[in-house]
């Protein structure tokens, strides 16, 4: 490979390596484990370097083509000019002249190389301390290498760029690979140090009693959650009475590190850091509030480091979702079991005990009879029998009494069976709630809710069905990392990236959705599972995009309950949409391929999926699928 081509690659690689932010700035941006942070950082680095590599390669190819058109004299003039500008000044940072004179204008290639070096020096100006000294030494080293190469070129009579430059190991990629190795080693060392600190905190925490732990939580909450101006009012100095709970100071010092990094940030980066600090503060305050309200056993579960922390260093999105839905499922199951047990116990005490005054009890008020339809029917039947018995005489009365006792026994058998059930299915109540919210015209067909669509909706859906048939809409499968899943949606020739992050509070589950167009976040929306759809506007090309979070319940093939959830999006302008669904059951998490559909919004803002014939609208739900 030509020496000149190697020189240019070295220059481009140097620019790429030093254009990435200092490693320390990203290390503690997310309040997750060390491994989560490292994984996210490496992902960002990889994307960043790949983009830089593609841009650099495109520039180099363009320069290569221009270079081929030069004659020998022009090439020699280029080498002499480059060497004169780069290698003769004593003070490299001050003496490089970036303005082209008249005789230099033809040598645009020279100036482009120098501009790359100028960008590197501009970045050097923002560095301070040891980092700046290190960068200066690297710049001087690179300068010396380039000057040596230029001296070699003057001695050569002819040189041409070789076609196999991409195969040479000393390319941008080779240099980047070496840089990644150094970064990886740096992060691993940081991770080990952090893990050692976490282990130390864990051991200290185990030695605390309940009273000391409560004092720690109260003081931490008071310092962190009551100040109006978080950046100005946090006091990082410990008073004498605060020195015992050392964890308080350590957590606050960690937050102080965030704020120190914030001071050196600017523009969008600063706004991003401020938002992350506020989010972290809110999460910590929520945890502290939960901790004060829970029992001692729940307190230990909330704050104690998990034993399998070291065994699972790479917690994925699925692990986080699995834990989230597990907690939601447990809470739902516990609440329904308690409610059911109360209803059953009241009814059993009133109607199923061996009492002589059973007939009097039947005639009493129904206020305590509960709300389940099957139980109400039996109670009504018992009352009807009792009314007939009072009016009957002789053999007829005895027959009615016998039938009354048989009905009572069946009724009590139903109660006993209900008491033995582990799960309570409440689909009928949920369906009634949906019907009330969605308005008139909705009917149930099988397991789906169907609604007649207007002529305009039908026409729009048929247009959307044609686009899907013509493959004018494409959606990539979800790619998940950490708490965030990403996909790319392409409609005609317009592309839009979408990513969502799942978050959970004590009362609800949310999907934080962001739309990215041309590398910039165009819109954001928080979607609560179960809420009515909400929309964002992505401009004239893509138009209004509506979103809905859906949650459903079902059973796996083994009979165990599972939770299904979907994020549905609808491009209103094109009448096409897509559902991204997942399920958690049997301690397994599964993501399904995206499902595209043609649809529209009704007058209530609800997203309807067009039926196969395009005449009816089907209410979106969480798909039922099994995990074995």
Curated annotation (Swiss-Prot):
GO cellular component, one term: extracellular region
Alphabetical keyword list: Disulfide bond, Secreted, Signal, Toxin
Biased composition (Acidic residues): 291-313
Propeptide residue interval(s): 20-368
Molecular function terms, GO-annotated: toxin activity
Coiled-coil annotated residue ranges, if any: none
Main location: secreted
Tissues expressed in: Expressed by the venom gland (posterior main gland) (at protein level).
Entry annotated with the keyword Lyase: no
Record localization: Secreted
Signal peptide (residue range): 1-19
Post-translational modification: Contains 5 disulfide bonds.
Keyword Ribosomal protein: no
Disordered: annotated segments: 290-313
Role of this protein: Highly abundant protein that may be responsible for the observed disruption of sensory neuron membranes, since it is homologous to proteins such as trialysin, which forms pores in lipid bilayers. Probable insecticidal toxin.
Family: Belongs to the redulysin-like family.
Protein name, entry field: Venom redulysin 1
Native source species: Platymeris rhadamanthus (Red spot assassin bug)
């Amino acid at each position: 490979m030509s020496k000149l081509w190697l020189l240019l690659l070295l220059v481009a690689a140097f620019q790429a390596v030093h254009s990435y932010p200092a490693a320390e700035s990203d290390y503690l941006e997310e309040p997750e484990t060390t491994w989560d942070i490292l994984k996210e950082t490496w992902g960002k680095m990889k994307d960043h370097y790949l983009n830089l590599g593609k841009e650099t390669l495109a520039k180099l190819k363009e320069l290569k083509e221009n270079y081929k058109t030069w004659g020998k004299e022009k090439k020699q003039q280029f080498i002499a000019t480059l060497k004169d500008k780069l290698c003769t000044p004593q003070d490299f940072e001050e003496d490089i002249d970036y303005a082209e004179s008249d005789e230099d204008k033809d040598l645009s290639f020279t100036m482009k190389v120098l501009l790359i070096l100028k960008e590197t020096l501009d970045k050097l100006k923002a560095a301070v301390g040891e980092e700046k000294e290190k960068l200066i030494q690297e710049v001087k080293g690179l300068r010396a290498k380039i000057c040596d190469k230029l001296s070699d070129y003057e001695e050569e009579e002819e040189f041409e760029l070789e076609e196999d430059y991409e195969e040479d190991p000393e390319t941008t990629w080779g240099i980047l690979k070496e840089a990644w190795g150094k970064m990886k080693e740096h992060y691993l060392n940081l991770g080990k140090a952090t893990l050692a600190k976490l282990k130390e905190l864990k051991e200290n925490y185990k030695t605390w009693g309940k009273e000391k732990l409560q004092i720690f939580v109260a003081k931490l909450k008071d310092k962190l959650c009551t100040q109006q101006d978080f950046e100005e009012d946090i006091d990082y100095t410990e008073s004498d009475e605060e020195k015992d709970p050392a964890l308080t100071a350590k957590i606050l010092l960690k937050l102080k590190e965030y704020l120190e990094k914030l001071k050196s940030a600017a523009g969008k980066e600063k706004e991003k850091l401020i938002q992350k600090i506020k989010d972290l503060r809110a999460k910590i305050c929520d945890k502290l509030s939960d901790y004060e309200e829970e029992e001692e056993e729940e307190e230990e579960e909330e704050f104690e480091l998990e034993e399998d922390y070291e065994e699972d260093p790479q917690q994925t999105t699925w692990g986080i979702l699995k834990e989230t839905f597990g907690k939601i499922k447990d809470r739902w199951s516990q609440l329904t079991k308690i409610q059911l047990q109360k209803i059953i116990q009241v009814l059993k005490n009133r109607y199923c005990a061996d009492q002589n005054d059973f007939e009097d009890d039947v005639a009493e008020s129904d206020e305590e009879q509960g709300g389940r339809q099957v139980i109400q029917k039996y109670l009504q039947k018992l009352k009807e029998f009792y009314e007939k018995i009072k009016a009957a005489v002789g053999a007829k009365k005895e027959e009615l009494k016998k039938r009354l006792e048989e009905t009572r026994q069946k009724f009590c058998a139903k109660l006993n069976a209900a008491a033995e059930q582990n799960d309570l299915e409440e689909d009928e109540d949920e369906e009634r709630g949906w019907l009330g919210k969605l308005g008139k015209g909705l009917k149930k067909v099988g397991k789906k809710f169907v609604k007649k669509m207007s002529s305009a909706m039908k026409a729009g859906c048929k247009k959307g069905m044609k686009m899907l048939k013509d493959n004018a809409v494409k959606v990539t499968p979800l790619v998940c990392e950490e708490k965030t899943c990403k996909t790319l949606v392409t409609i005609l020739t317009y592309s839009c990236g979408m990513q969502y992050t799942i978050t959970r509070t004590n009362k609800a589950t949310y999907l934080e959705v962001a739309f990215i167009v041309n590398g910039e976040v165009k819109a954001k929306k928080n979607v609560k599972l179960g809420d009515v759809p909400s929309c964002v506007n992505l401009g004239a090309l893509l138009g209004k995009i509506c979103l809905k979070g859906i949650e459903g319940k079902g059973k796996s093939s083994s009979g165990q309950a599972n939770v299904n959830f979907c994020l549905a999006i609808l491009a209103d302008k094109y009448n096409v949409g897509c559902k991204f669904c997942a399920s958690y059951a049997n301690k397994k998490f599964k993501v399904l391929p995206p499902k595209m559909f043609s649809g529209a919004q009704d007058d209530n803002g609800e997203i309807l999926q067009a039926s196969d014939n395009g005449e009816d609208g089907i209410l979106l739900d969480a798909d039922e699928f099994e995990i074995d």
